[in-house]
Regions:
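Membrane helix-loop-helix hairpins that form the core translocation module of multi-pass transporters
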Residues: 43-115
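Selective transmembrane alpha-helices of multi-pass membrane proteins
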Residues: 79-87, 95-115, 199-212, 220-242
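Small-residue-rich hydrophobic segments that form or flank transmembrane alpha-helices
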Residues: 4-73, 133, 137, 147-201
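Alpha-helical transmembrane segments of integral membrane proteins
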Residues: 3-6, 43-47, 97-104, 127, ...
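Helix-loop junctions at the membrane-solvent interface of multi-pass transporters
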Residues: 21, 61-65, 92-93, 115-116, ...
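Alpha-helical multi-pass membrane helix bundles of inner-membrane/thylakoid proteins
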Residues: 113-136
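Hydrophobic alpha-helical transmembrane segments in multi-pass integral membrane proteins
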Residues: 44, 85, 89-90, 95, ...
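Interfacial helix-loop-helix linkers and transmembrane-helix boundary segments
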Residues: 60-74, 90-100, 120-124, 189-195, ...
Length: 242
């Protein structure tokens, strides 16, 4: 039990640091190990979601003035609808094939954006927002990792890193809240999840403080390439695990 507490604490520090520094990645980081220490995959995604939600809440309180709702609401509403549907079919999914496809997709996307990001101009049109929200909803509902599609949209559509961080964290805060309610309805919010949250919250706060310092020293262009690299590494991890 003591070992699990230490592992959860350290995982929460790392995941919160990544989220605060890059604007996403809490679920990607923590879900590489969390399923192995939780009773079920559904409980792991639930714990990941509420810890990530806490991280996002802290950031939203700090960056609320940078939110532009007209660029946020369409992608957010699409995400909510799709992710709820994905959660309801979670128990019937075969993860082996999905992990392979997810890993390949993340690697291709990260390479494409890293080399062609200067040529890519993401317009804040409704079709683009719906597409990003749909992909994000599927990844969030199935894997608890809704970040990459939304982040690629926001990092291209927002004019500076403060607005990028405000938009992504408001998106993740609202999305994780809805997904937590859906997971609770499906029986994934258990006593074990509640206890895990108590152990992980201190790590979330520590990781957030460290990440906040690092974020202040990052330029906008460097932040983009860190995001692309992290998405690619995440894809490689999925392939190796599959």
């Amino acid at each position: 039990m003591d070992q699990i507490v230490v592992e959860l604490f350290l995982l929460s520090i790392g995941a919160s640091f990544v989220q605060r520094t890059t604007g996403f990645g809490f679920g990607i980081f923590i879900m590489t190990m969390l399923p192995s220490i939780m009773p079920s995959f559904g409980e792991a995604t639930t714990l990941s979601g509420i810890l990530a939600m806490t991280t996002s809440l802290i950031i939203v309180i700090q960056k609320y003035k940078y939110i532009t709702w007209r660029r946020l609401l369409p992608i957010l509403f699409t995400f909510i609808i799709i992710s709820i549907g994905a959660i309801f079919v979670l128990r019937r999914m075969e993860y082996h094939i999905l992990n392979i496809l997810l890993g390949i997709t993340l690697i291709i996307v990260s390479i494409y954006f890293a080399f062609f990001s200067k040529r890519i101009k993401v317009k804040t049109t409704l079709p683009v927002q719906v597409t990003a929200g749909t992909l994000s909803g599927l990844m969030g509902g199935f894997f608890g990792m809704q970040g990459p599609p939304a982040v690629l949209y926001f990092v291209s559509s927002e004019p500076d890193k403060d607005r990028y961080l405000a938009m992504t964290q408001t998106y993740f805060l609202a999305g994780n809240l809805i997904m937590t309610l859906a997971r609770a309805y499906n029986g994934f919010f258990t006593t074990t999840v509640s206890i895990g949250y108590v152990y992980g919250i201190a790590g979330v706060i520590i990781g957030n403080l460290i990440g906040s310092w690092v974020f202040k020293h990052l330029s906008g262009s460097l932040l983009k390439y860190i995001i692309y690299a992290y998405i690619g590494i995440s894809g490689l991890i999925f392939l190796l695990e599959a």
